[in-house]
Swiss-Prot record:
This is Cytochrome b. Heme b b562 binds at H84, H183. Heme b b566 binds at H98, H197. Keywords: Electron transport, Heme, Iron, Membrane, Metal-binding, Mitochondrion, Mitochondrion inner membrane, Respiratory chain, Transmembrane, Transmembrane helix, Transport, Ubiquinone.
Length: 380
């Protein structure tokens, strides 16, 4: 009998075991589509980014004009740029939904997969930040100045660290050049980490909405989930293309249409929408180092979720108290996002402080308490 190449060829075998013959729970819902959507986002960003890099000049005198030239004179350059800028937004929408799914269904109990995922989130945030600096508009320049300056809050070595990162005494040409180098490099780091993420995931197999072992009821990934994923791709790419064609600047800052000027500070310096929740947490602490620590903690707290799991049930499907807390947390993050976009004045300061406090309280205290209480109520 002839060998089946798909199952025996050294390289095809890896693809087969990951995308074709992979045993998958039969009941995973659409919330499990976001992993593959993130893969598509990554591919889209690398392709569009590569095409943009071919026309971009990483120099303070030329960066802004090179981006303008791309949009005016390069064939479909405007489309490539709009897809790349809005693709970042979709990347973050997908990753936040993916993390939310993981929190709700207890997927974080696959500890290695979860920890690599948090590292992936941090890498993605770094990539988006350095990328936002490249067009060298006002928001780019001042965003870079404000955020890199946060490192100066680190005791003793802070100032030295910031000047080393800048390559001088302020954000200038060396900063732009190194940010371009990093922005080119990091997506490939993300690809590598993604492969590690998948390797760990395929050691244990996917979780499912019931949070129970599904070894007795597995189906092959292809054709069931390949077709389901393709539907997800079509829907997401349709939304991305619609946004890029009909409202390309909807999520951007108008300030970035003004070339960078170190002598003029914009009235409101705020990051892109996907960083606003963390920015609100940073601003709600009236101390530089405290704010920086809270900002770091807002993401790093995800590393603690596997350690804080007290429930005897994995998923929240049958845990109404935890569900209420989960959706309160979602609303809380949306409030933080809104507060982060507002100026620092009376009602917003206190709302931001309350929302920041609630964010950490829910994750660190209320989730474990509610789960322990549910164990009691359900006599587990």
């Amino acid at each position: 009998m002839a060998l089946n190449l798909r199952k025996n060829h050294q390289i095809l075998k890896i693809i087969n075991d990951a995308l074709i013959d992979l045993p998958t729970p039969s009941n995973i819902s659409t919330w499990w589509n976001f992993g593959s959507l993130l893969g598509i986002c990554l591919i889209t960003q690398i392709v569009t980014g590569l095409l943009l890099a071919m026309h971009y000049t990483a120099d303070t005198n030329l960066a802004f004009s090179s981006v303008a030239h791309m949009c005016r004179d390069v064939q479909f350059g405007w489309l490539i740029r709009n897809l790349h800028a809005n693709g970042a937004s979709f990347f973050f929408i997908c990753i936040y939904l993916h993390i939310g799914r993981g929190l709700y269904y207890g997927s974080y109990l696959n500890k290695e997969t979860w920890n690599i995922g948090v590292i992936l989130l941090l890498t993605l945030m770094a990539t988006a930040f350095v990328g936002y600096v490249l067009p060298w508009g006002q928001x780019s320049f001042w965003g870079a100045t404000v955020i890199t300056n946060l490192f100066s809050a680190i005791p003793y070595i802070g100032q030295t660290l910031v000047e080393w990162a800048w390559g001088g005494f302020s954000v200038d040409n060396p900063t732009l050049t190194r940010f371009f180098a990093l922005h080119f490099l990091l997506p490939f780091v993300i690809v590598g980490l993604t492969l590690v993420h998948l390797t760990f995931l395929h050691e244990t197999g996917s979780n499912n909405p019931l949070g129970i072992p599904s070894d007795c009821d597995k189906i092959p990934f292809h054709p069931y989930y390949t077709i389901k994923d393709i539907l997800g791709f079509v829907l997401m790419l349709s939304l991305l293309v619609s946004l890029a064609l009909f409202a390309p600047n909807l999520l951007g800052d108008p300030e970035n249409f003004t070339p960078a000027n170190p002598l003029v500070t914009p009235p409101h310096i705020k990051p892109e929408w996907y960083f606003l929740f963390a920015y609100a947490i940073l601003r709600s602490i009236p101390n530089k180092l405290g704010g920086v620590l809270a900002l770091a903690a807002s993401i790093l707290v995800l590393f603690l979720t596997p350690l804080l799991h007290t429930s005897k049930l994995r998923s929240m499907t049958f845990r109404p108290l935890s569900q209420i807390l989960f959706w309160t947390l979602v609303a809380n993050v949306l409030i933080l996002t809104w507060v982060g976009s507002q100026p620092v004045e009376h009602p917003f300061i206190i709302i931001g402080q309350l929302a920041s406090f609630t964010y950490f309280t829910i994750i660190l205290i209320l989730f474990p308490l509610a789960a322990a209480l549910e164990n009691k109520l359900l006599k587990l």
